[in-house]
């Protein structure tokens, strides 16, 4: 999940006493300095995507290596230009998305940040769900799951390997075909 949405200020930021609409990223410094400027319009539902790739899974074990997660990419990031600070460390550390305690933290942060709904990528390959552990074992088992609604988005595409790994040459999509339940 790490999702890179936790703690992000919503784009709907608006000042109560003025008609000015604040826009990100231009007004980020102003908004971050004064949380009173943030106001969620009545009836607006804010959703964020949940990409379940920060936990060990059978899919990763098959394509990459045993225990591989997206954190491997974060750790191996290198600067592309002067001033580009890489690798970066996740603010909360490397949390395992398949654990309810991780989602208790994320759900609390979502609620505090005005995020109402998480839209989960849902993968189905080789006749079974893939990368489902974060939703089924983590999010749905968290004690505060009712604080954040959720929906599943069917990700009806092959898994593309877009970067070099130890176990593939990066040129093939996995699986060659996908199926539906």
Language model segments and positions:
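Bacterial Sec-dependent N-terminal signal peptides
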Residues: 1-16
């Amino acid at each position: 999940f790490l999702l890179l949405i936790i703690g992000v200020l919503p784009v709907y930021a608006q000042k109560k006493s003025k008609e000015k609409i604040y826009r990100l990223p231009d007004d980020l410094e102003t908004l971050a300095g004064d949380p009173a400027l943030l106001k969620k319009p009545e009836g607006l539902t804010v959703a964020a995507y949940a990409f379940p790739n920060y936990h060990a899974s059978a899919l990763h074990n098959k394509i990459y290596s045993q225990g591989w997660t997206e954190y491997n990419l974060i750790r191996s990031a290198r600067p592309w230009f002067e001033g580009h600070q890489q690798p970066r460390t996740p603010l909360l550390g490397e949390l395992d998305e398949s654990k309810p305690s991780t989602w208790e933290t994320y759900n609390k942060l979502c609620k505090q940040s005005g995020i109402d709904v998480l839209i989960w990528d849902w993968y189905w390959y080789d006749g079974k769900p893939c990368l489902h552990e974060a939703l089924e074992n983590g999010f749905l088992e968290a004690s505060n799951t009712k604080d954040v609604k959720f929906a599943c988005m069917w990700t009806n595409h092959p898994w593309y390997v877009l970067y070099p790994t130890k176990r593939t040459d990066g040129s093939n999509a996995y699986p060659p075909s996908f199926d539906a339940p």
